[in-house]
């Protein structure tokens, strides 16, 4: 298998900006460079806009695939003197289709209502894709991998009310159906002994508390984020399995000098009950612990953290360096310094909209078993 996925994006990027206030029809259009407004223009004029990125990529499992990713971002202005302008809200989407006739459609939203009285977050996904199962535990063998395919339909809807400055409390609902499994013959998943290997429905209610005083939710320069949530998957509301997850997330940002940022993230996920294998905590993705195959390790619990240094280069280009460590585990006795997974790497940033700090990122992460490239809209955290 090719360890580093070859990914490239069409360079004909499209940026459409839609000013909130009407402009003089006779005003001269802003000067552009390769389709992008000058830093001065984007720093003062753009309050909302849409960025669309065509994608083409190849992996051995799906062969060639093409699609489009994008983000729509906006702010709601204050209508009264007592109100404040909201931070940036955003709606993201991605869809791609493969040479093997597989489809992935994903959407996510993070919306502040006027005066930030409420925060609405959610996610929708339909996925019909191949995946890889390396076993359960933090010491699984990379070479003992099973290929499988499945379909997934998922919906999450989070409603939060601001009860004190920067403090939000609310509820979440998660509904997901996993079906249409196809396995490698004589694989461990095919036996049906692993919970969730025959599919099912996961239905949960969640209790969520969030403290967020970051200056920008897309790409913070300063501030803190702390989130604590509990999700209860119950047969009484349609869940095939009964289990619970408690999630913790902390992020801190320091601006040590203009546009030089140190960012810290710590994350934990702790499960109880009979957890289907697709809902287990995982290690290996495009944000925390970059440098491992997707979902390389799975188990009930996860704990990990990362540190990232972000700094400008010139024009719209910036650079980052990052390091992280973490692991999955069933019991605390499974954790050890010898088994802990580390990640380090670097990346390039291209500012699509400097005013709202919206970046394209190209990262290379290196882990214990090799490295991977990642090309994505937005920061890792």
Predicted regions and their residues:
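Bacterial N-terminal signal peptides
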Residues: 8-17
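Surface-exposed extracellular loop regions of Gram-negative outer-membrane beta-barrel proteins
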Residues: 68-69, 73-90, 128-132, 208-237, ...
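Sequence/structural signature of outer-membrane beta-barrel proteins
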Residues: 73-77, 96-100, 127-131, 176-180, ...
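C-terminal outer-membrane beta-barrel translocator/porin domains of Gram-negative envelope proteins
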Residues: 210, 216-313, 322
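Residues on the lipid-exposed face of transmembrane beta-strands in outer-membrane beta-barrel proteins
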Residues: 54-56, 68-72, 107-111, 157-161, ...
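Gram-negative/organellar outer-membrane beta-barrel architecture
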Residues: 42-50, 57-201, 283, 296-298, ...
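Short loop/turn motifs that connect adjacent beta-strands in outer-membrane beta-barrel proteins
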Residues: 24-25, 36-48, 76-88, 114-119, ...
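Transmembrane beta-strands of outer-membrane beta-barrel proteins
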Residues: 50-52, 89-93, 118-122, 167-171, ...
């Amino acid at each position: 298998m090719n360890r580093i996925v070859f990914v490239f994006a069409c360079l004909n990027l499209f940026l459409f900006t839609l000013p909130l206030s009407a402009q003089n029809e006779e005003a001269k259009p802003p000067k552009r460079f390769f389709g992008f407004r000058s830093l001065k223009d984007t720093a003062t004029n753009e309050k909302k806009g849409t960025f669309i990125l065509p994608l083409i990529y190849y992996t051995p499992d799906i062969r060639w695939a093409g699609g489009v990713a994008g983000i729509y971002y906006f702010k709601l202005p204050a209508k009264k003197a007592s109100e404040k302008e909201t931070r940036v809200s955003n709606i993201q989407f991605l869809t791609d289709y493969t040479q093997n006739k597989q489809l992935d459609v994903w959407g996510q939203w993070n919306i502040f209502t006027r005066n930030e009285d409420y925060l609405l977050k959610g996610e929708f996904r339909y996925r019909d894709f191949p995946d890889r199962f390396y076993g359960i535990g933090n010491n699984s063998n990379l070479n003992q991998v099973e290929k499988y395919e499945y379909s997934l339909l998922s919906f999450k809807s989070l409603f939060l009310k601001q009860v004190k400055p920067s403090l939000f409390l609310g509820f979440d609902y998660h509904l997901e159906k996993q079906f249409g499994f196809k396995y490698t013959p004589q694989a461990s998943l095919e036996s049906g002994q692993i919970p969730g290997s025959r599919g099912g429905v996961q239905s949960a209610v969640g209790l969520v508390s969030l403290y967020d005083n970051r200056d920008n939710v897309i790409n913070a320069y300063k501030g803190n984020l702390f989130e604590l949530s509990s999700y209860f998957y119950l047969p009484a509301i349609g869940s095939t399995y009964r289990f619970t997850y408690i999630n913790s997330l902390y992020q801190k940002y320091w601006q040590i000098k203009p546009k030089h940022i140190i960012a810290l993230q710590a994350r934990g996920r702790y499960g109880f009950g009979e957890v289907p294998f697709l809902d287990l905590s995982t290690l290996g993705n495009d944000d925390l612990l970059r440098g491992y195959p997707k979902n390389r390790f799975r188990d009930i619990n996860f704990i990990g953290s990362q540190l990232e240094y972000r700094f400008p280069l010139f024009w719209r280009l910036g650079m980052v360096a990052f390091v992280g460590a973490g692991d999955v585990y069933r019991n605390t006795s499974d954790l050890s310094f010898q088994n802990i997974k580390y990640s380090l790497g670097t990346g390039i940033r291209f500012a699509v909209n400097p005013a709202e700090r919206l970046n394209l990122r190209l990262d290379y992460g290196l882990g214990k078993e090799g490295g991977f490239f990642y090309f994505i809209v937005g920061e890792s955290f």
